[in-house]
Amino acid sequence: AGQQFQYDDSGNTFFYQMAEVFEKEQSIXAAXE
């Protein structure tokens, strides 16, 4: 999902990538728990 937004004009790509990683980490943590 994050790869669909590729405009480093204002660094939005970085934000989307961080959000995607954050969701994945939360999912992993939830599965682990």
From Swiss-Prot:
Membrane topology of this protein: Multi-pass membrane protein
GO cellular component: endoplasmic reticulum membrane
SS bonds (residue pairs): none
Gene Ontology process terms (BP): post-translational protein targeting to membrane, translocation
Organs and tissues of expression: Pancreas.
Annotated localization: Endoplasmic reticulum membrane
Protein's UniProt keywords contain Cell cycle: no
Keyword annotations of the record: Chaperone, Endoplasmic reticulum, Membrane, Protein transport, Transmembrane, Transport
Region forming the signal peptide: none
Keyword check for Transmembrane: yes
Summary of subunit composition and partner proteins: The ER translocon complex consists of channel-forming core components SEC61A1, SEC61B and SEC61G and different auxiliary components such as SEC62 and SEC63.
Function as written in the Swiss-Prot or TrEMBL entry: Mediates cotranslational and post-translational transport of certain precursor polypeptides across endoplasmic reticulum (ER). Proposed to play an auxiliary role in recognition of precursors with short and apolar signal peptides. May cooperate with SEC62 and HSPA5/BiP to facilitate targeting of small presecretory proteins into the SEC61 channel-forming translocon complex, triggering channel opening for polypeptide translocation to the ER lumen. Required for efficient PKD1/Polycystin-1 biogenesis and trafficking to the plasma membrane of the primary cilia.
Record-given protein name: Translocation protein SEC63 homolog
The organism of origin for this protein: Canis lupus familiaris
Species classification: Eukaryota, Metazoa, Chordata, Craniata, Vertebrata
